[in-house]
A protein has these predicted regions:
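Compact, well-ordered interaction domains used in eukaryotic information-processing assemblies
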Residues: 53-57, 69, 73
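Active-site-adjacent loop/helix micro-motif of nuclease/hydrolase catalytic cores
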Residues: 31, 56-66
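Conserved catalytic cores of phosphodiester-cleaving nucleases, focusing on short active-site segments
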Residues: 38-40, 46-55
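Short beta-strand or tight-loop elements
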Residues: 34-36
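Nucleic-acid nuclease catalytic cores
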Residues: 74-103
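Acidic-basic catalytic patches of nuclease active cores, encompassing PD-(D/E)XK
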Residues: 1-32, 125-139
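Basic, amphipathic alpha-helical patches used to engage nucleic acids or provide basic targeting signals
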Residues: 64, 69-70, 77
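Helix-rich interaction surfaces within compact, conserved domain-sized segments
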Residues: 95-139
Length: 139
């Protein structure tokens, strides 16, 4: 499929997207792969990772650790980097509107041996608003 302005960011093949990837054969001790719901790499200067959770579903420890380390590694490489935890209550069978999902937590990357930190407060902003502010988007 050719990508156009009209279909960028949209699922191109819904049937394929519903397929589940079995990572059970990729276990290393107690370490198993995790997925990343979304990432924006902005002009080699900023990176935004995002993870979507239904309502108040927790982030498994292993996934949290992996995402924090990715954010910190990007920061060490000189990129301003954050991870947004987004919440939604989208009914099963409907597409989740990423831009309108509520950001409830933000992890800000720390470079080198300095770890990052979590901002957990009622931001009252959706993912689009947080990304616009972080990236300085004036679109």
């Amino acid at each position: 499929m050719n990508y156009t302005d009209e279909n960028r960011g949209k699922i191109q093949n819904e049937e394929y997207a519903r397929r589940i990837i079995d990572f059970s054969g990729m276990r290393y001790g107690n370490i198993t792969p995790t997925d990343i719901d979304g990432v924006i790499e902005w002009h080699d200067t900023h990176v935004v990772f995002f993870e979507f959770k239904y309502d108040n579903a927790p982030i498994p420890d292993g996934q949290r650790i992996a995402l924090e380390r990715l954010v910190n590694n990007c920061t060490t490489a000189g990129k301003l980097t954050i991870l947004c935890i987004c919440r939604h209550r989208t009914p099963e069978g409907q597409q989740i509107n990423a831009a309108q999902s509520l950001v409830t937590d933000i992890y800000v990357g720390g470079g080198g041996y300095v770890g990052g930190y979590w901002c957990a407060e009622p931001f009252g902003r959706n993912l689009r608003q947080v990304c616009d502010a972080f990236l300085g988007w004036r679109g």
